[in-house]
Amino acid sequence: MFGEKFRDRQKPMVLVLGLGESGLAMARWCARHGCRLRAADTREVPPNLSALEAHGVDAQFVGGPFSPVLLEGVELVAISPGLSPLAADLLPLIAAAREQGIPVWGELEFFSQALKTLGESGYAPKVIAITGTNGKTTTTSLTGLLCERAGRKVAVAGNISPALLDKLSEAIDNTALPDVWVLELSSFQLETAHTFSPDAAVVLNITQDHLDWHGGLDAYAAAKGRIFGTQTVRVLNRDDSRVMKLAPSEDSEAGMVTFGVTEPKNEGDYGLLRDNGMIWLVEAHDRDASDEPAPKRRRKNEVATPPNIALKRLMPADALRIRGLHNAANALAAYALARAIGLPGASLLHGLREYRGEPHRVELIASIDGIDYVDDSKGTNVGATVAALDGLAQRVVLIAGGDGKGQDFEPLAAPVMRWCRAVMLIGRDAPQIRAALEDTGIAMTDHATLEEATRAAAALAQPGDAVLLSPACASFDMFKGYAHRAAVFRGTVEEIAAERGTMI
């Protein structure tokens, strides 16, 4: 379960850094397989320390600042995804580990090594992986549903929770290993993966996020690119220039499929067709092919738009239960991933129609007097809010602000100018958003609370508008998390509905 290095010897002494969900899962996994353990956390009493003891994990615990001294006797380092290798307190330890030839693995690498070991006994699942700045959870959940509708036994795990190794342990214990793994992966998880090679994977988009963790946008994009193995079918968003830089080289054996909100031009690609006021999900395919063409493995620079290409209409976008063009793109990505592992299209289309979406992700929570109230509290970065505005494609009173995480808010200007009637600003970094939007000519007002901002937005909105909570910021300056922020928004909307004689 730990690769060739440790195959024919005593199980390694493992240092687990960080006792969050993934750190706890790695500790349990290593203990399960007979490893000696040392667990370290900057907190003297981390919340999961009691859980570690409750699971009977025998580990030496060290609380306080990280130090290279922790490496004494250690043969393998297991690092939690929330810990940046560039952090001042961690960098010396990681550098020392590499100098000493000690591998540094994250949970995804443990998972990858475990699948290789299980493969020696004949276990050969399909593995689908999803990453991107925005849309990961929606696309992961939808892909899992599509695979189920195609009759496969599916496990969905990763950044979406539960932890990868917990899900794998459960499957092993229950003798219920799945046919397909569908994994939501963050850039943090991918940073410490070395041998991961899924059958199909997608990068949905790359916009500013977690730049402090990675050290810059280029490093962040490179981490996203680690999702692809040498033979992984790459599903890429052709509307995102940074994503398309991850296309395979001409001499690569990897296949490539693209998706986007534009019409596809190459065989096997997916997109949207606008015809007579309707928007269709479509696939580009050879006019001479069967109704169920095999997933296309296309080279990076293959000549576009051959003469026998036609657009096959899959379903109207209006038949999706998730709102917005960005969600239509997510649906295409999920469909492309499922097709890339050979699943039949007909059953997948039924799944697309069935999926209802995830909470707090452009979620319609009420329509009151002709005004939609939309919860996108999970929109914690600029790219998510841009996608929500462009995806809804209607007049909006936007509620934005919070902890901006050092982002550049300038990309908000164009969609705000196009779609917004007004912007309600909240939170610590409201002044930065105001500065970025000051030349748009859109009215902006500052509010001390989300409740106040929601009521002000409701007063300004007109029938046909949406009041959209899409903060473009993290929530921790005012709330316990994005779910708490969403609950406050929903509670205020419920009060507004009751005052107007409506129940939601």
From Swiss-Prot:
Task: State which Enzyme Commission number(s) the record gives.
Answer: 6.3.2.9
Q: Which UniProt keywords apply?
A: ATP-binding, Cell cycle, Cell division, Cell shape, Cell wall biogenesis/degradation, Cytoplasm, Ligase, Nucleotide-binding, Peptidoglycan synthesis
Where does the record place the region Disordered? Answer: 286-305
Which pathway does the database say it acts in? Cell wall biogenesis; peptidoglycan biosynthesis
- Annotated Pfam families: Mur_ligase_C (PF02875), Mur_ligase_M (PF08245), MurD-like_N (PF21799)
Q: What is its main location?
A: cytoplasm
Report one GO cellular component.
Answer: cytoplasm
Q: Which GO terms describe its biological process?
A: cell division; cell wall organization; peptidoglycan biosynthetic process; regulation of cell shape
Q: What does this protein do?
A: Cell wall formation. Catalyzes the addition of glutamate to the nucleotide precursor UDP-N-acetylmuramoyl-L-alanine (UMA).
Q: Which HAMAP family match?
A: MurD
What PANTHER family does the record tag this protein with? UDP-N-ACETYLMURAMOYLALANINE--D-GLUTAMATE LIGASE (PTHR43692:SF1)
Name of the protein described by the UniProt record:
UDP-N-acetylmuramoylalanine--D-glutamate ligase
The species this protein belongs to is: Paraburkholderia xenovorans (strain LB400)
* Gene from which the chain derives: murD
